[in-house]
């Protein structure tokens, strides 16, 4: 079985990367996953994928003044949840934790998405959400503790390096 651990289907353009053209929907992702890809000369497909929203669409500032933290979380996770529900045989939910939506809101959402929706992993995108995990322990420690309690792994991205830096 081949499992991709980082896919970002969406029904809207990623707000951070300003991609042009059509959004990378669940149908496009499934088509990509179906391949075929040749491994040791044999045609294969990607059997399952951990999916989460594109990180640019999880930035809290785009809802400032319109929604509270929990509403913002549920909005940015909505398409991922829809995909997981529609194709549970192919997609595994990965919750994106953004402490800028409120630590309490985020920790409660981790538990809700794992227990109620069957999500199996949590991702922290410190670079997109503008914090350093080593300096924001009050933000990340409660989330790590909740993930440990629930037995779900955490993927943490701390920086994107560019050439010359």
Question: What residue ranges belong to the model's regions?
Answer:
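Proteins with a high burden of low-complexity, intrinsically disordered sequence enriched in S/T/G/P/A and R
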Residues: 28-31, 37, 156-165
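Active-site gating/metal-coordination segments in enzymes
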Residues: 62-164
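An N-terminally biased module of ancient metal coordination in phosphate/nucleic-acid-related enzymes
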Residues: 1-72
């Amino acid at each position: 079985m081949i499992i991709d651990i980082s896919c970002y289907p969406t029904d809207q353009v990623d707000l951070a990367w300003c991609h042009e053209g059509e959004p990378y929907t669940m149908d496009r992702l499934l088509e990509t996953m179906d391949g075929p890809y040749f491994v040791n000369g044999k045609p294969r497909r990607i059997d399952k994928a951990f999916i989460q929203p594109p990180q640019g669409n999880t930035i809290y500032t785009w809802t400032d003044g319109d929604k509270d933290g929990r509403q913002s979380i549920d909005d940015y996770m909505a398409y991922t949840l829809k995909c997981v529900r529609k194709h549970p045989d192919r997609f595994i939910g990965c919750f994106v934790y953004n402490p800028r939506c409120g630590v309490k809101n985020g920790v409660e959402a981790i538990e809700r998405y794992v227990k109620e929706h069957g999500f199996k992993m949590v991702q922290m995108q410190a670079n997109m959400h503008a914090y350093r995990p080593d300096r924001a322990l009050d933000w990340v420690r409660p989330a790590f503790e909740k993930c440990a309690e629930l037995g779900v792994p955490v993927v943490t991205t701390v920086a994107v390096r560019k050439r010359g830096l």
